[in-house]
């Protein structure tokens, strides 16, 4: 069977992207830079734009010239060292042979995905991530597949997982934590404007770019929900909000809870409700049994308290996350350079 691109690897009906805001949040002054090599990766498709993820991302109306289209195969890439291993496959450093563009190539085994029954989760991850363009969201440039494997062409984040850096340093200081909070709030504002809830924000799902800038990855648990209301249990135990544990309908405010949990973990070194048993963790989350060690500054405590509210409607809105005095005082966010206007 020949390798294909831009048709889903399983017999699901195709869906078009739901309409959303095309502008980025106000604090992001420009889109993530698009290099000529990235344009090549994004534009190779066999169908019309706006159909399925992986198809033409950059429109001709933006001033970029037409690029000849053809499908990718594994032979288009030089495969380098492994970047990570998972239950369903591996991620490799790779280089596209013609453009020499460096990417992360995620190689997934169909047999494992089918065995675990997560075809829909993967399809959702591809469909959502392919339509997101923000400096703090890991890009999915394209994908293709063959009889045994599915290949996702992802942006390469040179500094790897935030989780690994946290393990090395044990905790982060105020400046680094506040910077991550601003980056995360900006990226989630963009996602929520497009009716996308991530639902699984945690250090393992956050990568770091060359300058240490945050990159949200792993949209496997995320959902494109036009109503922004769901009732599915998902996410990571220590990061689950009360409404999900209690089986209540939830909305985009679950991501606000996750920001609060993440901020605590970065400053303290462990999640706020971590306990010896799952039941005890559940109990502490539902009661919002929040305790701070003396090392956490009062400004950070106030920030976390305002996010970790049992009632979702009382949580600090995303717009106020970046505007919180503690974040404004300590954040040192660096925006990416301007994107090129056209391909030479």
Swiss-Prot record:
Subcellular location per the Swiss-Prot or TrEMBL entry: Nucleus; Chromosome; Chromosome, Centromere; Chromosome, Centromere, Kinetochore
UniProt modified residues of type Phosphoserine: 62, 227
Lipid metabolism found in the keyword field: no
InterPro entries registered for this protein in UniProt: Aur-like (IPR030616), Kinase-like_dom_sf (IPR011009), Prot_kinase_dom (IPR000719), Protein_kinase_ATP_BS (IPR017441), Ser/Thr_kinase_AS (IPR008271)
EC number: 2.7.11.1
Main location: nucleus
Keyword Acetylation in record: yes
Described purpose of this protein according to its UniProt entry: Serine/threonine-protein kinase component of the chromosomal passenger complex (CPC), a complex that acts as a key regulator of mitosis. The CPC complex has essential functions at the centromere in ensuring correct chromosome alignment and segregation and is required for chromatin-induced microtubule stabilization and spindle assembly. Involved in the bipolar attachment of spindle microtubules to kinetochores and is a key regulator for the onset of cytokinesis during mitosis. Required for central/midzone spindle assembly and cleavage furrow formation.
Family, as annotated: Belongs to the protein kinase superfamily. Ser/Thr protein kinase family. Aurora subfamily.
Protein name, per record: Aurora kinase B
